[in-house]
Curated annotation (Swiss-Prot):
Keyword Transcription regulation among UniProt keywords: yes
Pfam families, A to Z: TAF4
Keywords assigned: Nucleus, Transcription, Transcription regulation
Subunit structure, interactors included: The 1.2 MDa TFIID complex is composed of TATA binding protein (TBP) and the 14 TBP-associated factors.
Native source organism of the sequence: Eremothecium gossypii (strain ATCC 10895 / CBS 109.51 / FGSC 9923 / NRRL Y-1056)
Protein origin, superkingdom: Eukaryota
Protein name: Transcription initiation factor TFIID subunit 4
Bias-annotated ranges (Low complexity): 96-107
Gene label: TAF4
Length: 361
């Protein structure tokens, strides 16, 4: 029968268990004589970290587990027994076992402080107390700086006087059966003053914008848009020129006298006078004007008098075409304010009605 490669390799090794090389020059390990694999040996002869706690249990009846400890195990021992395995242990392994026991004995002393055990940041070298002290000092410094800056900023004066606002609010609240003294509510008075300021500012801003648009010249479509309007305007100009020539001819012949002192009232003046008279009559005034009652009849001799203007010319008055330049008031006028108030929906109905009643061109 042929030999197995394992038996051949064992034959090449020496009796002393030295390393051997095969035919290809590779090392296969160390062969020991009379060594057989056995199970783990957890005998009591081996020193363990728990041996240090025997004396402590008797004194304080309290045992603390070590932070780190590993039981010494022997996975492969010679067939001679546990005593021969312990005797063959190298000095380096014995030294390591002693260091482990020392570490296990010193661990409870280091972990006895609860403050150090509860703080995980202590192992990283962070001092919590020092950090808290630094944070509190920073907050105190920021508060002091903010107080200094606030004291240096001047107070903004209110738009409306607080006492006047409080009296007005009290009056309006009394109308709604709600009695309260608002003079002590400084924050509420400041809020109402700011709201009034914003309301009036908005109205004035809109009025300024409307005034600028009103005075701005329109450059596009400045010519006449309708041919009919142009023809009617030319006819009116010719008729006015003819009427002026006729009046001049009659004045030259002595039929009419040129008006110098007497001024004919325009339609606007008559309208204002009639309104003033109507207001006086409504108010209960006793004064009456002759032109409101049936006046005396005009004598025929007055019309024949050449020194007076004829009734036709007097009746004509300023009727006809009026030439005037386009006149726009500078700044903000009443119609600009009314236009700005028309965009409001609450509390402006009476104001708009009074404004249109007083507006005058």
């Amino acid at each position: 029968m042929g030999k197995s490669p394992k038996a051949a390799d064992q034959g090449d090794t020496g009796a002393g268990g030295k390393k051997t090389k095969g035919e290809d020059g590779f090392s296969f390990g160390i062969d020991a004589e009379e060594v057989e694999p056995t199970g783990s040996d957890f005998s009591n002869d081996m020193p363990t970290p728990f041996d240090n706690f025997v004396g402590q249990d008797e004194q304080s009846n309290r045992a603390e587990l070590p932070e780190s400890g590993q039981p010494a195990t022997t996975l492969a021992l010679p067939a001679g027994g546990a005593g021969s395995g312990a005797g063959r242990k190298s000095p380096q392994k014995m030294q390591r076992a002693g260091m482990r026991r020392a570490a296990g004995a010193g661990a409870p002393k280091q972990q006895s402080d609860p403050d150090k055990l509860s703080d995980a940041l202590l192992s990283a070298g962070v001092d919590i107390k020092e950090e808290e002290a630094l944070l509190s000092s920073t907050v105190t410094t920021m508060k002091s700086n903010s107080q200094v800056s606030n004291s240096q900023i001047p107070l903004h004066p209110p738009f409306l006087h607080p006492s006047h606002v409080a009296s007005m609010m009290k009056k309006v609240a009394a109308e709604q059966n709600f009695n309260q003294d608002f003079s002590k509510s400084s924050e509420l008075l400041s809020l109402m003053s700011t709201a009034c300021e914003l309301y009036i500012r908005d109205i004035i801003t809109n009025s300024i914008i409307i005034s600028r648009h009103r005075r701005k010249a329109v450059k596009l479509n400045s010519g006449r848009r309708s041919e009919t309007t142009r023809v009617l305007r030319d006819l009116a100009l010719k008729q006015r020129e003819q009427e002026e020539r006729r009046v001049k001819r009659r004045i030259a012949l002595g039929l009419e006298k040129e008006i110098t002192d007497t001024k004919l009232d325009s339609g606007e003046t008559l309208h204002r006078a009639s309104n003033a008279t109507a207001n006086m009559m409504i108010a209960g005034g006793k004064k009456k004007y002759s032109w409101l009652t049936s006046g005396s009849k005009v004598n025929a001799t007055d019309l024949k008098n050449p020194g007076k203007v004829s009734s036709a010319v007097a009746a004509r008055g300023d009727l006809g075409i009026k030439f005037r330049e386009a006149r726009e008031e500078p700044g903000i006028v009443m119609r600009d304010l009314l236009h700005a108030l028309e965009n409001r929906r609450v509390g402006v109905n009476n104001t708009i009605a009074k404004g249109y009643a007083r507006i005058r061109d």
